[in-house]
Swiss-Prot record:
Organism: Sus scrofa (Pig)
Function: Macrophage-restricted adhesion molecule that mediates sialic-acid dependent binding to lymphocytes, including granulocytes, monocytes, natural killer cells, B-cells and CD8 T-cells. Plays a crucial role in limiting bacterial dissemination by engaging sialylated bacteria to promote effective phagocytosis and antigen presentation for the adaptive immune response. Mediates the uptake of various enveloped viruses via sialic acid recognition and subsequently induces the formation of intracellular compartments filled with virions (VCCs).
Domain of life: Eukaryota
GO cellular component term, pick one: endocytic vesicle
SUPFAM superfamilies on file: Immunoglobulin (SSF48726)
Cell membrane is among the record's keywords: yes
Compartments (UniProt record): Cell membrane
Pfam families per UniProt: C2-set_2, I-set, Ig_2, V-set
Membrane-topology annotation of the record: Single-pass membrane protein
Quaternary context: Interacts with TYROBP. Interacts with CLEC10A.
One annotated GO molecular function: carbohydrate binding
Domain Ig-like C2-type: 139-227, 238-316, 317-405, 415-505, 511-593, 601-705, 708-790, 798-893, 897-976, 983-1082, 1083-1165, 1172-1257, 1259-1335, 1346-1442, 1443-1529, 1537-1630
Name this protein carries in UniProt: Sialoadhesin
Membrane topology (Extracellular): 20-1642
Length: 1730
């Protein structure tokens, strides 16, 4: 439809041109490859031109050149093949339209297109100018038009246009980034001869939120896209204004530094004004940050901030500031009288939160139940006087108000008048009167109606009187007491509110009791009590002693001695003296206090009986009491954690802050009570109560069973058989982690698993039992109280039995029992006659029939049996679930012996034998008893009793009864009594004869009837038994011989070996019980033999040999152990040729038998003695004040060395037998400068001696920082130099960061307002007459808000474009940094939040944040904002990312393996482009390599030597440009490692093994000894040993062995590996190398000595030749020599032929003698003249 409209437009345009020959078409048209385009075209001609045969329309391509036909309306065949099917003429020529549609565009279609139309001969027209068509590969960037200025609320149109129009394949324009709820889009296509275009319009109503918004318009055609972005700059008033509170989440305390920051989310332009308002009143401060340096009461209120700019302003939401503090207001104000009501209000500043909780304390004691804001004291008394304060608390903390004093005025109470004489310094009497009164009372002391003293000053001013007074106190001291001073004294107290008085009868001759050494002593200490009196000592003087008012002693001694005071001696003592003339008054009481250590605490842990049971409301009680004076400090521990303590935690008046909410702690002297509400599983277990005081400690434990584990049976505890039952273990616990449940039935383990429920389906009678459950968690375990499960079922068939009871008379007992639940009702019948029933027992109490009923049992006793009692008896059982019955026939028989309780007896039982006849007992009947056929003469009654039967009384008993006057006897059948007993007195004896036969003997014996079965076990293996035949036991092993007898078992082991060792157990069992006896057999089959002795001196030869007797020698594995550590190898012996202290250990050999545990021999301790060594002398100084100096001397020596410590040649201390071995400690309290100097320590033992010394210097000078070492900027700071030893005049020299600052007599530096420049280390130097002393540096830290923020950026384009944005700031404490881009947070100092483009990597350092962003377009100039904030304030800065300049790009990368091809390209900002006549210079490590005209530097095979820093310099027509350097890393596998061995030359005790390798990247190094990993460059990869120290550095691994043990010697292999390969090397490390080194040194010494000898001989020969030469020169006429040349050798013939060299000087002689070339030259003959 749109296309038809376009054609109509073209047609209308054609009508306008009818008046002339014209062609209208655009000058240019653009298209995209693969798409299409339209050239809109209209033409016209004069109206007078006739059209006889129509109009021919023709389009040409390159009309002025090739003139190719594109379209022909009459003859399509002439169209060029290139345009066939792709060019289409739109419209009809008769309508004057000539538009051309060109499809499937190709770049070759670019060029000029011309239109020609032909009407007839002579009427033709061609458009010569034509239309230029441009076809590109990708679309051009669309054009966006927008207003120059944008502001909030404005409605604006954004037009996005493109020149591409294609009707067949639409060209799409699309807006992105807008808010669809506030915007609409519309589009418009233009297709006119004047030109073609496509426009998309975005209509938006702007909001402040659109500021910074990125809008993009994207054109898409032919599957290709191109877009353009615009960044909106919308002007608006500040938005999102809010206040950031520095104390968010915590309380603002008085004096805190509070910071309020006015934060603005968005503002354009920037905020220009800030106005702070508090409680509606404007503040003077107009900065973004409002600081309250010391928060106070007046600072509380509601704060708002108003931020404005040129557009407008906005106000933040109000923020309430509450200063967390309190003060107490007392009402009424002024004097408070008794019985008044006093109100104390706990006031807080404004904006106090509603969740505040209040507590009140009086005199630092918590007032229970007072938790409201006001405390009301009704009808106050003097007891209410005191200091009160309130405590406010919320979830963030607690704060206490200043205390206020409440004073209750009241009249004077009865005065306290006391008197005592003082006899130590003459006769002095002291009278003391004190009273409780408010206001203070006036005190008057009178005697005999006369005023002796008063607080007002009136009274008798006798020179013997001395008066002292204080508020509410008066003291009178009377010198030279006399009889007139005795009598009644009165003390009167008066005030404006009332009067009071008291009297005292004073005796001037009263005694005085003194306690020595003190009135308070420690238990066990001796105490002396002395009685002093004014009486003259006479022979008849006697002293009476009283304790707590009771007379305890009377005698002539004036002293009472308690040799060892105990707690029973504590109390109130007084004494009295008397003689024949007079009696003294009683002494004032004196209290003796005996201090004692805590006794054993009485500790109970239980549930409160009132709340015990399952469910909520339970309460656990822990109560610990102790007897201690002084009171002990108590603390309760549970699983090693302190849960309560009598000490105050936190210093508050309330209960300890460390207790959790369910726990309440009550404290009293020597008592600690803990209440646990709703105790959980974690609260159960053993608690320990510890009592401690300065005199000792004691403890007691108790177990708390909180019943946190409860077993519940549903649907009920009582169920009918066949119903389902669920057993659930309900556990009250705090943790919710995994748990394991164990189920117990009748005390035995029944089931286990993770489920807390067990189901019985269906339940049966066998399930009836007592059940319990147990939970096991990480926090602990808990066992429930057993619960009984009752199962109901109908009666089974009853069991009916008849027994002859011989208890009383001829009696039969019928017993009917049944199994049923609930219990059954039983009834017993003879025939149809009911005899007895369990429900109705109506039989006569003394009748012949007696019935007894119990649960499911009915017993009928029939006495005086007769034949009529014979017959059929049956029993019926009935309950609610059913019934059953059974019957039997009973026949009465003759006389018998009745035995009670049974003929089968256990030893010690009581037994009664009765002789019974069926007709009953007649009077006068005689009885005789027989045992084993022998009459018992001692028994003639009808009964025979044994109170406790013994084995000797067992046998066959019968009785004979004969009635009086009858000749016949009734003889009973014999009854046999058998006495049995359980096994007892079992013994197992083991004996070992280690002689030649190595015989082991085991003998087991026991007493038992019936005889016990004896079993002898070796471990769990049965080796002998009384049930086996002798032949069978003997055949089991030829070395074993077994012998058996009743209750006896004997085992002989011949040739005992290792396998026979172990624990043997003898079990003795019969029907009455069992007993065990165990014994260990030590066959002594394995032991360690030490030669020459187990105690040797260091350096001796020691041999340890194992001896073993075994039958499986080939199957055994032998091991050696040293201090429980297994040694490598399985040698028969260990040879220590040169034993060292490291060999001192416990040795034992072990044998491992297949299938059995390891067996070890008895350990043998090898003790190595050595002389003192490693002598160390150290000192420690107290860190603060220098009050204590400790000098410590330690040594390594065996036997322990005698240590002596001396100072300046003077012996100070020496070790004794009671000292810690090899340690001597000297403590110097309050050290003085004279204590400084050289200290020497000497260690002596029988094997040697060692000495060392130490210079002691005292650090008495210190720097103190007040108020703290860390203060905010602007706060006052004082730096003080403290030197206790300073003596005036003193000079103080100050240094700041090691630089001189000032000097003078002032010991302090004061900074009224600290700045950053004041931060640093301060040191002071003190100079006085004693010398110069200097302190250690003390660091001062200054806190300040962020400032000097810098945002910088650069490009890192080594492989792909990467932008680096870096933000730095100056801040203390370090700032929290946020980096954002166009309003979106990219990264913070906590990590990456989100990136607008690419993937980012964040690097964080102190006050520095760096963001690396990949794939950022180099034209990106968007703004980055960095916000820095700490607790003191914030600052922000912004910057733009500058376009990228010349840079180096590496392909395939900058980290390449060795041998790889590599290209380094010098990229220009505009890309490869046209480089013209540019040249490129390349540099490596700053040195120029070469210059080329191409921007690429090629490496065919890169080598490791070519690694380094590269950069390029481009010489362009516009000038030179240099890139940033890039680092090229060449990667290669490790080379063969280099291993170096160092061994201590003196003895090989210490050694170093060093392994190094060359590789890139760094290699991972490992060091192996055989298969054992010794060291690795990876941390904690190898197990650390105490004597091995491993240090790793890049491509290096070093092992230091302080003690080179035999197990550490051998072939070491060093392996190096990285991602490209690995390599290894091996070397020997041990004393063998040291031995070879010694041999090599000896060889060198020998060769050197030999060479020296040869040189000496050669020198002597040269000297001898020289002397001979000179001698010949002196003998003129005998020899003459003519020199031919310098290089010739002269040969002389004499009687003795000699070869000598003659030259100008002696040097030529040496050359001839030592240079072999001279010996090889051709000699020439010369003439000699004699």
């Amino acid at each position: 439809m749109d296309f038809l409209l376009l054609l109509l437009l073209l047609a209308s345009s054609a009508l306008a041109g009818l008046a002339s020959w014209t062609v209208s078409r655009p000058e240019t048209v653009q298209g995209i490859k693969g798409s299409c385009l339209i050239i809109p075209c209209t033409f016209g001609f004069p109206a007078n031109v006739e059209v006889p045969h129509g109009i021919t329309a023709i389009w040409y391509y390159d009309y002025s050149g090739k003139r190719l036909v594109v379209s022909h309306s009459r003859n399509p065949k002439v169209v060029e093949n290139h345009f066939q099917g792709r060019a289409l003429l739109l419209g009809q020529a008769e309508q004057r339209t000539c538009s051309l549609l060109l499809k499937d565009l190709q770049p070759q279609d670019s060029g000029s297109y011309n239109f020609r139309f032909e009407i007839s001969e002579g009427n033709r027209w061609s458009d010569v100018k034509g239309t230029v068509v441009t076809v590109t590969e990708v679309p051009s960037v669309p054009t966006i038009a927008l207003p120059a200025k944008l502001h909030e609320g404005m409605e604006v149109d954004f037009n996005c246009s493109t020149p591409y129009v294609c009707p067949t394949e639409p060209v799409n324009l699309q807006w992105q980034g807008q808010d669809p709820t506030r915007s609409v889009t519309s589009h418009l296509q233009k297709l006119e001869p004047s030109g073609t275009s496509h426009m998309e319009t975005l209509h938006m109503a702007l909001s402040w939120q659109d500021h910074g918004r990125i809008l993009s318009c994207q054109v898409s055609a032919a599957e290709r896209r191109m877009q353009k972005e615009i960044h909106l700059q919308v002007q608006h008033a500040p938005k999102g204004v809010e206040i950031l509170f520095s104390h968010s989440g915590r309380n603002v305390l008085p004096g805190d530094l509070v910071t309020l920051s006015c934060q603005v989310n968005s503002s354009n332009p920037q905020v220009s004004s800030v106005q702070w308002v508090k409680d509606g009143t404007k503040l003077k401060d107009q900065k973004r940050v409002l600081q309250l340096r010391r928060a106070a009461w007046a600072d509380a209120g509601v704060y708002t901030c108003q931020a404005g700019n040129a557009v407008g302003s906005s106000v933040s939401p109000p923020v309430s500031l509450h200063v967390f503090m309190a003060e107490v207001q007392v009402s009424p104000v002024g004097s408070i009288l008794e019985n008044q009501t006093v109100t104390l209000a706990c006031n807080t500043p404004k904006e106090a939160p509603s969740e505040l909780r209040y507590s009140w304390c009086k005199n630092h004691a918590l007032l229970e139940g007072s938790h409201s804001r006001t405390l009301r004291l009704h009808s106050v008394t003097r007891a209410d006087s005191g200091f009160y304060f309130c405590e406010v608390q919320n979830a963030r903390g607690r704060e206490r108000s200043p205390p206020v004093s409440v004073v209750v005025s009241h009249p004077p109470l009865t005065p306290d008048l006391t008197a005592f004489p003082e006899t130590q310094a003459g006769l002095v009497g002291i009278l003391q009167c004190s009273v409780v009164s408010e206001p203070p009372a006036t005190l008057v002391l009178s005697h005999g109606g006369l005023i002796s003293a008063s607080t007002s000053g009136e009274g008798d001013h006798s020179p013997r009187f001395s008066v002292a007074s204080a508020p509410n106190s008066l003291r009178l001291e009377i010198q030279d007491l006399g009889p007139t001073d005795s009598g009644e004294y009165m003390c009167s107290a008066s005030s404006s509110l009332g009067n009071a008085s008291s009297t005292l009868d004073f005796h001037a001759n009263a005694a005085r009791l003194l306690i020595s050494p003190a009135a308070e002593v420690v238990e066990g200490q001796a105490v002396t009590l002395s009685c002093r009196s004014s009486l003259s000592l006479m022979p008849d003087t006697r002293f009476s002693w009283y304790l707590n008012g009771a007379l305890i002693l009377e005698g002539p001694s004036s002293s009472l001695l308690l040799p060892a005071a105990s707690s029973t001696d504590a109390g109130s003592y007084h004494c009295r003296a008397q003689n024949s003339h007079s009696t003294s008054g009683p002494s004032p009481p004196a209290v003796l206090t005996v201090l004692r250590a805590p006794r054993q605490p009485v500790f109970t842990a239980q549930l409160d009986p009132d709340t015990a049971g399952a469910g909520a409301g339970r309460q656990g009680l822990l109560l610990c009491r102790v007897d201690s004076d002084p009171p002990a400090q108590l603390q309760l521990l549970h699983r090693g954690r302190v849960v309560a303590s009598s000490l105050s935690w936190g210093g508050g008046c309330c209960t300890c802050g460390g207790c959790f909410q369910r726990m309440k702690v009550t404290k009293a002297p020597n008592l600690l009570r803990v209440e646990i509400r709703d105790p959980a599983l974690e609260d159960e277990g053993v608690y320990l109560c510890e009592a401690s005081s300065a005199l000792g400690n004691a403890s007691a434990s108790a177990t708390l069973d909180a019943q946190a584990t409860v077993l519940v049976i549903t649907p009920s505890h009582t169920l009918q058989e066949g119903i389902e039952a669920n057993l659930t273990c309900n556990v009250s616990r705090e943790a919710s982690g995994p748990a394991n449940f164990s189920w117990f039935r009748d005390g035995a383990l029944w089931a286990q698993g993770p489920l807390d429920t067990v189901t019985l389906l269906p339940v049966s009678r066998t399930d009836a039992a007592l059940y319990a459950c147990r939970i096991v968690t990480e926090a602990g375990a808990g066992l429930s109280t057993p619960v009984a499960l009752n199962v109901l079922y109908p009666p089974d068939p009853p069991k009916l039995s008849a027994l002859l009871d011989v208890d009383q008379g001829h009696t039969a007992v019928f017993v009917c029992t049944v199994d049923s639940h609930p219990l059954a009702q039983l009834a017993l019948f003879r025939g149809e006659h009911l005899l007895a029933a369990s429900s109705a027992l109506r039989l006569p109490p003394r009748g012949r029939l007696q019935a007894k009923a119990s649960a499911n049992s009915l017993q009928l006793e029939v006495r005086d049996l007769s034949l009529g009692d014979s017959g059929s008896y049956h029993c019926e059982a009935t309950n609610i679930l059913g019934s059953a019955n059974t019957s039997l026939t009973f026949q009465v028989r003759g006389a018998w012996v009745r035995v009670s309780p049974s003929p089968e007896l256990q030893e010690g039982q009581a037994v009664v034998l009765s002789c019974q006849v069926p007709i009953g007992v007649l009077e006068g009947t005689s009885y005789r008893w027989y045992r084993d056929g022998q009459p018992l003469q001692e028994s003639t009654s009808a009964t025979l009793r044994f109170a406790a039967i013994t084995l000797s009384q067992a046998g066959a008993y019968h009785c004979q009864a004969q009635a009086s006057g009858s000749a016949t006897t009734d003889l009973a059948a014999p009854v046999s009594l058998h006495v049995t007993y359980a096994p007892r007195q079992a013994t197992l004896t083991t004996l070992m004869d280690s002689g030649l036969g190595r015989l082991g003997l085991l003998l087991c014996r026991v007493n038992s009837d019936p005889p016990a079965q004896l079993r002898l076990l070796h471990g769990s293996r049965l080796v002998a038994s009384t049930l086996q035949g002798v032949e069978e036991l003997a055949g089991s092993s030829p070395r074993l011989q077994v012998a058996t007898a009743p209750n006896t078992l004997r085992l002989e082991i011949h040739n005992a070996v290792l396998e026979d060792e172990g624990v043997y157990t003898c079990e003795a069992t019969n029907t009455l019980g069992q007993t065990l006896a165990s014994a260990a057999l030590d066959a002594q089959a394995m032991r360690v033999q030490v030669w020459p002795n187990a105690t040797v001196q260091e350096g001796q030869l020691v041999n340890l040999t194992r001896l073993v007797w075994t039958t499986h020698l080939a199957q055994l594995t032998y091991t050696w152990y040293r201090d429980q550590q297994q040694l490598p190898g399985a040698a028969h012996s260990i040879l220590l040729p040169n034993v060292t202290v490291t060999d001192a250990a416990s040795y034992r050999c072990g044998i491992l038998i297949p299938g059995q545990a390891l067996r070890l021999s008895r350990p043998v301790a090898l003790d190595v003695l050595y002389a003192p060594r490693r002598l160390r002398l150290t000192h420690l100084l107290e860190s603060r004040g220098g009050q204590l100096a400790v000098v410590l001397c330690t040594v390594d020596s065996r036997p322990a060395a005698q240590l002596t410590l001396s100072h300046a040649g003077r012996l100070l201390a020496s070790s004794t037998a009671a000292s810690v071995p090899n340690t001597l400690r000297l403590e110097l309290w309050e050290p003085r400068p004279s204590d400084e100097g050289l200290y020497s320590c000497s260690a002596r033992s029988p094997l040697g001696q060692a000495n060392t010394s130490l210079e002691l210097r005292l650090e008495g000078v210190q720097v103190a920082l007040a108020p703290s070492a860390t203060v905010p900027e602007g706060a006052p700071v004082t730096v003080t130099c403290e030197d206790p030893a300073a003596r005036p005049p003193t000079l103080y020299v100050w240094y700041h960061n090691s630089r001189w600052l000032q000097e003078g007599s002032a010991a302090s530096l004061s900074f009224p307002a600290a700045t950053r420049a004041h931060a640093g280390a301060y040191t002071c130097q003190v100079q006085d007459a004693q010398g110069t002393r200097i302190s250690q540096p003390a660091a001062l830290h200054i806190l300040y808000a962020p400032r000097d923020a810098v945002l910088s950026s650069f490009w890192d384009s080594r492989a792909s474009p990467m932008a680096v944005v870096q933000c730095t700031v100056d801040s203390e404490p370090p700032a929290e940094m946020t980096l954002s881009h166009d309003g979106k947070v990219l990264a913070t100092s906590q990590g990456v939040h989100g990136l607008a483009v690419g993937t980012g990597h964040v690097q964080v350092a102190r006050n520095a944040l760096q963001l690396r962003v990949q794939n950022v377009p180099s034209r990106d100039k968007d703004t980055y904002v960095c916000m820095d904030r700490n607790s003191l304030g914030s600052v922000s800065t912004m910057g733009q990312l500058q376009p990228e300049g010349v840079h180096v790009v590496a392909e395939p990368g900058l980290d390449v393996p060795e041998g790889t091809a590599l290209n380094l390209s010098c990229r220009l900002p505009s890309g490869p482009g046209h480089i013209g006549n540019s040249t490129f210079a390349w540099f490596r490590n700053g040195r120029q390599l070469h210059t080329e005209s191409v921007p690429t530097f090629t490496f065919t095979h890169v080598a490791r030597a070519q690694a380094g820093l590269y950069h390029c310099q481009a010489e362009l027509p516009a000038g030179a440009a240099t890139s940033a350097p890039v680092l090229l890393r060449v990667l290669y596998p490790p080379k063969t490692p280099t291993m170096t061995v160092f061994v201590e030359p003196e003895g090989g005790i210490q050694g170093i093994l060093d392994c190094r390798v060359d590789s890139e990247p760094l290699a991972s190094l490992t060091l192996h000894l055989g298969s054992r990993l010794v060291a690795s460059s990876q941390p904690q990869a190898a197990p650390a040993k105490p004597h091995i120290r491993v240090s790793a550095s890049p491509n290096a691994l070093r092992v230091d062995m302080e003690e080179l043990k035999p197990s550490d010697q051998g072939e070491y292999v060093c392996s190096a590996s990285n991602a490209l390969g690995s390599a290894s090397a091996a070397t020997y490390f041990g004393t063998r190398a040291l031995h070879r080194l010694h041999l090599f040194q000896h060889l060198l010494w020998f060769l050197g000595l030999l060479a020296s000898l040869l040189f000496l001989l050669l020198g002597l020969g040269v000297w001898y030749a020289w002397r001979r030469g000179n001698f010949h020169k002196l003998r003129m006429g005998e020899y003459s020599v003519e020199m031919v040349s310098r290089k010739e050798t002269t040969q002389m013939s004499t009687d003795q032929e000699e070869v000598t060299g003659i030259g100008d000087d002696a040097g030529s002689v040496n050359q001839a003698a030592f240079d072999p070339a001279h010996l090889c030259e051709n000699t020439q003959s010369v003439k000699s003249t004699v």
